[in-house]
Amino acid sequence: MDTKVKAYICSPLSAETDQEIQQNMVYARRCVAEVAKEFGYRAYAPHAYLPELLDDHDPEERALALSFGISVLEHCHLLIICGSRISSGMEIEIKKAFQDQMAVFRYYPDNKQTLIPVKDWRQLDEMQIPVKDISE
């Protein structure tokens, strides 16, 4: 039986172009690897791979992908928000984590070995960086 802490990686996926979606998938995979290495957690990011099977621009397929992600989230111990921006899909995942009284943290890949606890949903608005200032 696996006794490692299971961490759900929450990072942006949706983007206007397929190239941007691919970049976001690579970013999610990087976060999975870093969280596993830095904290020893078993990290999950379904959105790092699902766009290879499902079209994020198709509403039905996007809903299916979000549903799958929520199912994976329900099997995790905590949620880690990666990056500086909260997308609409991330918002759904984060609200579910708070609803289930799951521990929620922020992680910035440039600030390794640090998880910042998020105790309240309102903190996320304070941490949000305007879209025009984002380079991820």
Predicted features and spans:
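Conserved catalytic or regulatory cores that recognize and/or transform ribose-phosphate-containing ligands
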Residues: M1-E136
